[in-house]
């Protein structure tokens, strides 16, 4: 190959790489990426790549955007800028708690989201222990998520903790999907959920608190004030403040019965 030909190939490769970078940047600048920019993502999760975090290097901005783009209604369909930003604050608030490496009561407690990608106690429900931003747990959830995403997550659950795009997709899938008598987190935060008579009797009212109930109500709800609720709310408020969104009402589930009761 001549020097001229080699130079041409190198230039072509550089041009192709530049086009891919521009395309990725353009995709990020639309939809969710218009609110959660790379800079905002880094500011929200400043310690995710800390040397103390087992998930360091895993949760990338590009992986989040790629996953979000697979769910066009996620973080884009609130009907107002306020609700769009509130949904994203709520999503990151809940998932940051699920993956937190923060120390309760410390000054930077709510700056340690996305520190973990796998549950610490893997004996909880092997091999379907918690993985990813939402800590997807249990064979039924791996089956349902896999069916929705076109992946064999029952046969290969480790995909959720080894492929960052898949990991984010499972979290967003859970967020967007109603299951049984539980509404979707998406509908709740956008004010599209109307409680049934049973919900009202159980104290389940629209707001961030019922999202906690959807995710982990069997442990955290109906038991009065507890550290987990406080942590979820703290992350949520921090992100609302960063994104310029109001908190809404009913932030906790202290007095709500869980959906299985």
Swiss-Prot record:
Catalytic activity: Random endo-hydrolysis of N-acetyl-beta-D-glucosaminide (1->4)-beta-linkages in chitin and chitodextrins
Signal peptide: 1-29
Enzyme class name: hydrolase
Keywords: Carbohydrate metabolism, Disulfide bond, Glycosidase, Hydrolase, Polysaccharide degradation, Signal
Gene Ontology MF: a single term: chitinase activity
Induction comment from the UniProt entry of this chain: By glycol chitin and fungal elicitor in suspension cell culture and ethephon in leaves.
Organism domain of life: Eukaryota
One GO-annotated biological process of the protein: polysaccharide catabolic process
Xref: InterPro entries: Glyco_hydro_19 (IPR016283), Glyco_hydro_19_cat (IPR000726), Lysozyme-like_dom_sf (IPR023346)
Tissues where the protein occurs: Expressed in roots, leaves, sheaths and meristems.
Disulfide bonds: 53-115, 221-253
A Pfam family it matches: Glyco_hydro_19
Documented EC number(s): 3.2.1.14
Active-site residues annotated for this sequence: 98
UniProt xrefs under CDD domains: chitinase_GH19 (cd00325)
Matches recorded under PANTHER family: BASIC ENDOCHITINASE B (PTHR22595:SF171), CHITINASE-RELATED (PTHR22595)
Family statement: Belongs to the glycosyl hydrolase 19 family. Chitinase class II subfamily.
Protein name, UniProt field: Chitinase 8
Name of the encoding gene: Cht8
């Amino acid at each position: 190959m001549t020097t001229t030909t080699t130079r041409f190939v190198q230039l072509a490769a550089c041009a192709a790489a530049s086009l891919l970078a521009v395309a990725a940047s353009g995709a990020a600048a639309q939809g969710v990426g218009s609110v959660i920019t790379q800079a905002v993502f880094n500011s929200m999760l400043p310690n995710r790549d800390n040397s103390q975090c087992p998930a360091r290097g895993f949760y990338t901005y590009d992986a989040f955007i790629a996953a979000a783009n697979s769910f066009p209604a996620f973080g884009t369909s609130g009907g107002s800028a306020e609700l769009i930003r509130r949904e994203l604050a709520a999503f990151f608030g809940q998932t940051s708690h699920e993956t937190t490496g923060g120390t309760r009561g410390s000054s930077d407690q709510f700056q340690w989201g996305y520190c973990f990608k796998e549950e610490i106690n893997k004996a909880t429900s092997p091999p379907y222990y918690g993985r990813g931003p939402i800590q997807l747990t249990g064979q039924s959830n791996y089956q349902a998520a896999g069916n929705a995403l076109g992946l064999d997550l029952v046969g290969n659950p480790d995909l959720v903790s080894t492929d960052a795009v898949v990991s984010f997709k499972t979290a967003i899938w859970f967020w967007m999907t109603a299951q049984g008598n539980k509404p979707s987190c998406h509908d709740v935060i956008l004010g599209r959920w109307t409680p049934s008579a049973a919900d009202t009797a159980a104290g389940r009212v629209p707001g961030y608190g019922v999202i906690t109930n959807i995710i982990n109500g069997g442990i955290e709800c109906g038991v009065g004030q507890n550290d987990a609720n406080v942590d979820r709310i703290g992350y949520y408020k921090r992100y609302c403040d960063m994104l310029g969104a109001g908190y809404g009402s009913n932030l906790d589930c202290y007095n709500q019965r869980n959906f299985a009761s």
